[in-house]
């Protein structure tokens, strides 16, 4: 099949490399890992890592500055460069494992797909000058192999998830609509907009006010009572497998059996809630939840199959070789045109969990990669 998108390798802008630091080059033919004895070359892994760095630079630097890659942004003892490289080499392992199991699902690349991959790789090389190519460590063979692996991954995922159970019962999919008022038990905004903590006396008074509000809502409507008490009515949906609502709130909602039913005052650690069941079955939300369940089953199956293959394989990473890949320079993207995104694409988006970075195009850089 000829699919519509690759990893949009040739689309929205021109990248410029800067801030060069000790760029002595790397040997693209060096073995960075082995998979059941198969040598995985550094060239593809390096290209994937630099591609991801180039894509992320503008966003990260706008928030965290030029030292982003050497910073421990999340306080876990790992720099952003280390974290990104760890994700990339994990992706590389996945790609080659999937390639080695193509026969398990009768997955092949058509002549048309292979030709499109070759054309895209050649176009990428033609669109970038020598300095740009060196900055990403790209060769036509490396780009071709990377796009081949990504395309195989997409086709393998499609084949694997075809076995997922897509039969979701109405009961499992059912999603209800509700309205609610929530009132903070701990703090409030004063006239100047500053956050103030309630005193114990104020907390007792607040509890009484919320009870009176509930009684007013029961006598009139939730909306009318909210207007009277200066509260805001919000809305939401919930299903039986909801994991985001407080347990007390979900239990109260599940106890409402008829549309229009009002809950008692529900108390959580930080809020009071008054809830109203609006629709036992929200048709649109129910269908959306059905698709979410199917999507989760597909992802779970894909991950289970892939992990099984990985468990059975022997992947050995040469840490010293992988350490040679560094993000010593930074990239800036200049958007030229969005039309090219439609004209230069070749394979479907890979699955959401494929960890492949998208949107790199023409690059202007000066790093040497051998």
Predicted features, each with a name:
Residues 208-249, 283-285:
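Peptidyl-prolyl cis-trans isomerase
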Residues 24-137:
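N-terminal targeting/tethering segments
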